[in-house]
């Protein structure tokens, strides 16, 4: 879904500002996070699950964030599925 990464980046920036980061620091961290993730996916043959295991230290900040994003029944998977289904339905309507 084109625009999803940009939307996620915007959400990361907003969250950074909401937790006290300056606008420029929030922007830099959000963009750096997405760029680094894209590079890892592009430059390795590893599956996303394996990369997640490598970057999420047990008890660390990444793991804490992923626990929220991946909460079953109310997490990122459900949001992404709903977004893809909406785009798919609209595509069918448009022909």
Region locations from a protein language model:
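Anionic-ligand binding region
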Residues: 1-27
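NAD(P)-dependent Rossmann-like dehydrogenase/reductase catalytic/cofactor-binding core
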Residues: 27-95
């Amino acid at each position: 879904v084109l625009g999803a990464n940009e939307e996620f980046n915007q959400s990361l920036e907003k969250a950074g500002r909401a937790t006290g980061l300056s606008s420029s620091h929030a922007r830099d961290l959000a963009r750096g996070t997405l760029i680094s993730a894209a590079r890892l996916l592009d430059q390795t043959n590893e599956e996303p699950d394996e990369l997640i295991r490598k970057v999420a230290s047990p008890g660390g900040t990444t793991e804490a964030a992923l626990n929220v994003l991946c909460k079953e029944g109310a997490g990122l998977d459900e949001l992404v599925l709903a977004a893809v289904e909406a785009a798919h339905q609209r595509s069918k309507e448009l022909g």
